[in-house]
Structure formats: structure tokens, C-alpha cells
Amino acid sequence: MARLSVVILNWNGRRHLERYLPSVVEHTTGQAEVVIADNNSTDDSLVWLRINYPDIKVIKLDKNYGFAGGYNRALKHIDSDYYLLLNSDVEVTAGWWQPLVEVLDRESDVAVVAPKLRSATDPAMFEYAGASGGFIDFLGYPFCRGRILSAVERDEGQYDDSRDIFWASGAAMCCRASVFHALGGFDEDFFAHMEEIDLQWRMQLSGWRIVVEPRSTVYHLGGGTLPPSSMKVFLNHRNNLAMLYKCATPWQRLAVAVIRPFADGVEALGYLLTLHPHKAWAIVRAWGQFLVWHRSLAHKRKAIRRTHSVRGIYRHSIVLRYLFGARSFKNMM
């Protein structure tokens, strides 16, 4: 049994594996192992792995279950104390995983530890997906230490302290295996996007903490700064609304019900005015799917174990703060 399993979920990602897997294999030694979970790839990923890394454990899934379902199924076959979920487009360096395990070993009430994420294409900059730890505002909009909406900061050591956060990016998150399984893992209805924040919110409602440990730094290629596809817009909006309905307090849900339709309507109008009608329609479809899910979400909400109040939700609007000039996390707090 490994202390730590670094699990990379792959779907048609041969080019990312070829570019980034060598650093992961080189710097993941000792009591840690590397596992590839494959979401039924149709490219030559598995052939390439068999030729170049014949000793790596590969878990083959029978179809593409997305991020949520793929990890849920793969992790059932991995016997380890801790899982380090890692995107296939992440580069690591020597000593990258040990600080994360040290936190979990030392602090028994921590469920997830995040490394600091820098950009693989511009290493002096934070990376959009997670930077130095994630938060959300009361309307459910995510932001990071190092990234406010689309404004990404340069990493000058300003967020190098280890501290509690609200969420760790699914691009690189180290979690306690027992807690992951006890809470049922990711919500597979999400398929992809927001599922890691949803899980970590549920963890906090059960009394667990989420922490960032910047002594561990990884470099993520990512796609957060690229123009989002209509599918990404749809998944982000639908899953965000579902997460809020499941996890938020009644007062927060009331605020979301009153304000979010207007805010999302303004966003959809912006897409229309900039000649992106498919993205505007994606927001409409997201609300429609959310309403269809209403009954099943009510059951999920009742099933969540709520023994603790969750702190760390930003009580103001990140969007308004951004519109009034806030471009760094330090300006927010």
C-alpha cells in the first residue's frame, strides 16, 4: 500500500502525457506511486504509455465518465492513504509532493491540501485555475489568492503563507482517501467543472479543513485564460447553481435566487452583443437544466451531513469589487 498515489486522469491526452509525465515520474519516488486513469481514450495514449512507461499502473475505464465519474471509479481501485489528483498538463519539480503529505500527516482535521499553481507558459505568473488557493463570494463566484476573475497576478511571494482556503483546484489537489470515500467522492452529475469545489464545501460542512501549502509549487498549462467554449460556459453555470442549492445556507440561497438571474442575464446579454450567441444560449440552458434537477438536488441537499458552519465565504460581490478596480487578492481583504 502506497502512502500517496498521484492519479492522473487522461482522455485523449497523449501530447500532454508526452510533455508533462516525465517530470511527474522523475520527481515522484519513495512512498509515492504514479497511476494513470484512462477515460476510454481513442487516441494512442495507452500505446504510448505501454511503450514508454510499462511499469506505470493504468486503470482503463469503459467510457468517458468525465472528471467526476472518472476519478470516482478509478480511486475505488487504488489503496492509498492519500490521493494526489493531478491534471495531465501539470509539470512538477523535485520535492513537490512531500510538503502536501507533511500537512496531512501533521494536521488530522485537514482533508485537502493544495499546492501553489504557477503558469507553465509564464512561470512568473500565477495560474488561473488555482493560484495560491481558492475562495468564493456569497453569490458563488470563485476567485483565488493571485487571480480575481480574469486578472491574474505575478507571483512575488505575496501569498507564500500556508493557510485555510475554501477550495483547492482539481488541477492539483492532495486529499485524504478516507474522507473522499466517506463523502461519496465527486458528484457525477456534474461531469466536469465545479465538482472539486462542491466536494470541498461538503467536506467543510462535515468539519474538515482545506489548506494551501505554497512550499509545494507546480506548473499548470491549463485553459482558464482561453476563450471559453459554450460547453464550458454551460457546465460552469449549471454546476455552480447546483452546488449552491446543495450546500449554501437558506439566506445565501435566497440572495442567489434574487441576484443571480439578473447577473447571469447581463452576462448572456454581453455574449449576444459580442456576437457569441451560443454562449448566451449556454447560460439559458444551464438555468433550464438546474430547474429540471431541482427535485434531485433537494434530495442531495438533505443527505449532506451538516455538523459545522462554513467560514471563509467572501461576504461581498467579487464582480462589483472587480468593476470598482480590485485586481489583486490583497485589495479584497
Spell out what each predicted region is.
Residues 7, 206-302, 307-317:
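Active-site-adjacent helix/loop segment of glycosyltransferases
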Residues 160-217:
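A short, conserved alpha-helix in the catalytic core of glycosyltransferases
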Residues 23, 38-47, 63:
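A conserved acidic beta->alpha catalytic loop
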Residues 31-40, 59-61:
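Short beta-strand/loop segment that forms part of the nucleotide-sugar
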Residues 23-31:
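Short, acidic, metal-binding catalytic loop of nucleotide-sugar glycosyltransferases
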Residues 91-141:
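Conserved donor NDP-sugar-binding/catalytic core segment of glycosyltransferases
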Residues 83:
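Short aromatic/hydrophobic "clamp" motif used to bind/position activated sugar donors
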Residues 60-78, 88-90, 99:
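Glycine-rich, basic loop-to-helix element that forms the pyrophosphate-binding segment
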